[in-house]
Amino acid sequence: VYIFQLNKVGLCKSIRHILSNPDIIKCGIALKRDLAELMQLSPFDPEAVIDLGAAARRADVPHHGLRGLTALFLGFRISKRASTTNWSARKLSAKQITYAATDAWVGRELYFKFRDKKLL
């Protein structure tokens, strides 16, 4: 997992290429706002973006958020405590970095579970 503070460095061409590449799947929960904020940094056409919360709703899964889906499909709970901290800080704390890495890893693992269970 790579963590970039894009509000500090901007959205470089290589990251825009990843976000616009239909061959690279990008997944997570409630991505609409994240994508809008990224497009404010630099315009791009998002491709192969999968919102797992929306997929869960379409499949009538009882949970739609990161914590609930993680518990249901991966069998453990993650803390959301660091999610409400100051993400614009010049230097992220170890807890913020761990949360961001966990969020990305869990999204990837949930994608595989959803794919295997044909929920996408």
Segments from the language model and where they lie:
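Conserved DEDDh/DEDDy metal-dependent 3′-5′ exonuclease domain
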Residues: V1-K113
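C-terminal helix/juxtamembrane-tail motif
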Residues: D116-L120
